Amino acid sequence: MNHSIEFIETSLFTRQIRMIATDDELKALLCELIESPAKGDLIQGTGGLRKVRMATGHQGKRGSARVIYFLVTDDVIWLVMAWQKSTKDSLSAAEKAALKKLTQQLKGGV
């Protein structure tokens, strides 16, 4: 069942996604998240962030981009970070700790 979801981008996400994906590729991801908001894998140690694969260019999802997002409520998703898999495999412990602080702030704002 579809329902309305508000997507909010961090400034970091906006900068990163512009470098790696087209508007249509981003729209395709947002449609996937509307269909299944909890689609991404939970990232341990981040306070609830999820990581999802995103197809970009002529690459499939497996070797393409990664998007980190936070499902704050059933109808609000924060888009936090994005990167090409070829440039980064996963988050470092320091990044996870910083992102956990962010998720705590976002939870407090609900």
Locations of regions flagged by a protein language model:
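Amphipathic alpha-helical interface surfaces
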Residues: E9, E25-L29, S64, V76, ...
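Enriched for short, Lys/Arg-rich terminal
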Residues: F70-V110
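Basic/aromatic recognition patch in beta-strand/loop cores that engages polyanionic ligands
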Residues: L42-W83, T87
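Residues that form generic nucleotide/phosphate-binding pockets
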Residues: Q16, E32, L102-Q105
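Arg/Lys-rich, positively charged N-terminal/basic patches that mediate binding to nucleic acids
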Residues: M1-D24
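Compact soluble domain cores
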Residues: L12, A21-D41
